[in-house]
């Protein structure tokens, strides 16, 4: 482990310009690296794609953009041949140039479609929006670790989705909102969109859960950003199951008016199966879901795949579930290997509301989910590790349940703010947070003794991440370890196997997920999840969450004093390297911060004393501290098991100074700057702090000494923390900049203009030539309304760090073409050495 003084943590970016400049300097080093094209390998898909007779015709009728790209490629190839360069060298050079351009190119996003479709149909816009800091939610370059890269697919294969075909015998009843069908045993049905599922007869499987007949209705989200869930009949009455699917209106589709990342992810125009079941409905009828037989049924021609389980995955889930309440499993593996998918399937399987299982065990204590992946968490926004207690299965990707606040299907027991998407910047704090969450799980067992535990470990599995993983395997008292890759590498599998052997627990190795391409990168999914987090609400009157399309700039903020007699914010901490107090205002304004409840005035880890985790705290007289404590004592030694006397942990003692005495007031704004440490800021002690959620600092009112915070944290949750005597500290970490919040007003203005154009076109169609006086009066007001909407767009586009391109230049066309590209996952991106710099 590194010492505190030796950690080279990057400070939080002072501005978007500084972040962009730093990234440009890093991008200049890319050409010197060797392309890793030889390291790419993919695992075979679970099922081979079946080519249909219509595919050839579809390819011939495709748009001409692919043909143009082919001619450009052939022209470049001829020029390279004339220059005397061999094909192999030219291929490597081209691959290197593409990677360099994608790393240094500013992100762009298209935004308009000329077709005036219905309110629920997906749409594009023609403008390209650029974020000047190169870290926007619409960034097209790969993630920082380089395990995703944009690729162009010549044509989409026609992939089979549903085995069931709807007809008069299988459709029981249908209307504009509802569809009730029969599914025969071993047959399945795939839907695209979001809907409520009710199992009336038989037993069906969905995303690992076995759903039996009951009065319970399950909300299902099936966007095109992920593999589509499959509804399969596994047992039926007279060989058939009966399900009812109903449209739901949660408002999540409205987020497409605020971000292009939410466009083209739900169902498009009605498919042939939809039209069959909507014969008696009006021509304009459209549900929030569509039945798909094959991927070619999609009107938007997207890359759609069903979510099928590998046989090894099914066997492992069945074996793990037989441990019932004694299950304590850690799921780890490389990035993009399917850890989250497997965890979600196992979670849903354990939470299946079956009357009883083969072992006569019925889960009434729920399932504990310990999420140690701060980059792609399942039930919280990025930058957090947490322990959740769940009582019902969840059907949808993480951005459909970014928070459990106010929900009836689960709750967050405790969470800690890591302040980054990777724990490698401060592994000591990460391990202490994991140990505290594990202690909370042991306390949870007192009330729910048969509650199993699922631990989701991040893809940080090499180098120091492997050291942390092996230490957790030895320390957490697990029952199983699952590694999500059959291709090694040996330098990872062997230490994990040795740690599992020493802990006397089995290690199961499973193949990684069969998905090779995704339509959203991990950075884009993080932006979608945190944007969903800030727009989601959980009314107490209903069981399902709702999403509001009100932009962040128009949302009602929390106004809190940071100075004076009514001070509500005790301190502001900036994780990473120390900054000048004069820069705190610039670092904080417009940033995402963690709202942390400090449960003790001695919540800063100073490293002044130490103790083994399994022993009680030593009093001051027996402390090993002699006033000159080494920095090594503040770190967590992970070379030995938990019973080793060399295992130490930093903690606070009554002799630790109060963090109130460590606050420095800034000269101009009087902000309470909290910093403790030498070179880098010591984080809050996980045993004495709890993260309530995230907030966006919308403005800092210096004259009145107030902060405007936009946060979805329920007011009751903050009030309870204050009533218990906890102080509120804002922690500014190194999370992605909220560029999505900067562009929301622009996209909302464009959506309003498009909605007005659609209403005008519909009015003209309904009234003919506008014969009546009301129509004439409305037509006279149309120029005024259109001018107001255009002025709104103009004002919304004048935002710092954002540029709108509205021309039809080559740069615009190339950006629009890149938006149609997919992201290829690098599954065999294993290092040749143990150095993390290879990644």
From Swiss-Prot:
Compositionally skewed regions (Acidic residues) per UniProt: 120-131
GO biological process: cleavage in ITS2 between 5.8S rRNA and LSU-rRNA of tricistronic rRNA transcript (SSU-rRNA, 5.8S rRNA, LSU-rRNA); rRNA processing
Keyword Nucleus assigned: yes
Leading EC class: transferase
UniProt keyword annotations, A-Z: ATP-binding, Kinase, Nucleotide-binding, Nucleus, rRNA processing, Transferase
Task of the protein: Polynucleotide 5'-kinase involved in rRNA processing.
Entry protein name: Polynucleotide 5'-hydroxyl-kinase grc3
The organism of origin for this protein: Aspergillus clavatus (strain ATCC 1007 / CBS 513.65 / DSM 816 / NCTC 3887 / NRRL 1 / QM 1276 / 107)
